[in-house]
């Protein structure tokens, strides 16, 4: 194999080449034979914080909200929104979640503060189960992350934000402590709709997790994950990040998730348009997300 062929097949070259092509096209302008440009990816930023303290009841809720470091921005009513790192409410219409879940049994995998579980409940679900781990030390993240937690004395139990939102919203969502590796129809039965967001890149065995989710899904599951920009058309590749000072184990290629979901047993998959949802603390950093419907219809 020539040096040129070796370089062309290397992963860095395959990752960089689409970006170089895009830059070249941008500098040179579109050619007469070039394909129509794809529509720009929608970008969503967190809204301004809303923590009014005009009434005694609002003040009591806000005081409780301020005691927690929030991952999700959740509408608690009375004009109060939690100051979450991510605000999924503005782009909510882009997510492929059915508008009407009346009578459905639903599952939220890795619920954290519970935004998606409460949203499924709001859409009429008959039952919502919210899966979570018990402690930060139960996370399946790279070992040096856990060692850092231990050095800093981080043993915090999860679910604090969930319990606050659950109480204020008068919710009936059922939060269960269970690792996704232990998820099974024997323990939980089957679900009409499953939502799983930003989980697979953070665990050692995403295929096993997909298999377990498939086993409890009798209708459809929606997966939302980050992916490598510029990786469309490069095949279902996956690369290891765990030694790069990152809380994720993996970086997925654009086509990995659909192929992995089919390999895990789902009958068919449908991709939805990607979006870019920015973090509150770093609004200038792109956070591209791919969204996939995986369907069983058992």
Short names for language-model regions:
Residues 157-165, 248-265:
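Short alpha-helix
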């Amino acid at each position: 194999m020539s040096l040129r062929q070796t370089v062309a097949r290397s992963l860095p070259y395959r990752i960089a080449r689409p970006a170089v092509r895009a830059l070249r096209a941008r500098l040179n302008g579109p050619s007469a034979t070039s394909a129509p440009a794809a529509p720009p990816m929608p970008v969503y930023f967190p809204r301004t914080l809303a923590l009014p303290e005009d009434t005694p009841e609002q003040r009591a809720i806000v005081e409780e909200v301020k005691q927690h470091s929030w991952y999700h921005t959740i509408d608690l009513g009375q004009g109060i929104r939690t100051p979450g790192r991510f605000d999924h409410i503005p782009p909510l219409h882009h997510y492929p979640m059915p508008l009407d879940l009346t009578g459905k049994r639903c599952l939220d995998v890795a619920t954290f503060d519970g935004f998606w579980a409460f949203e499924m409940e709001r859409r009429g679900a008959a039952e919502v189960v919210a899966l979570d781990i018990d402690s930060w030390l139960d996370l399946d993240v790279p070992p040096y992350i856990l060692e850092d937690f231990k050095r800093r004395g981080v043993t915090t139990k999860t679910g604090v934000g969930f319990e606050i939102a659950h109480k204020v919203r008068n919710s009936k969502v059922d939060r269960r402590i269970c690792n996704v590796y232990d998820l099974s129809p024997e323990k939980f039965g089957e679900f009409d709709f499953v939502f799983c967001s930003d989980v697979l890149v953070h665990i050692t065995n995403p295929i096993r997790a997909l298999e377990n989710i498939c086993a409890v899904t009798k209708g459809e599951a929606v997966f939302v994950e980050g992916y490598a920009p510029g990786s469309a058309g490069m095949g279902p590749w996956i690369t290891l990040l765990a030694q790069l000072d990152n809380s994720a184990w993996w970086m997925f290629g654009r086509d990995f998730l659909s192929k992995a979901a089919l390999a895990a047993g789902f009958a068919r998959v449908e991709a939805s348009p990607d979006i870019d949802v920015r973090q509150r603390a770093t609004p200038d950093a792109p956070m591209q997300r791919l969204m996939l419907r995986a369907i069983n219809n058992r």
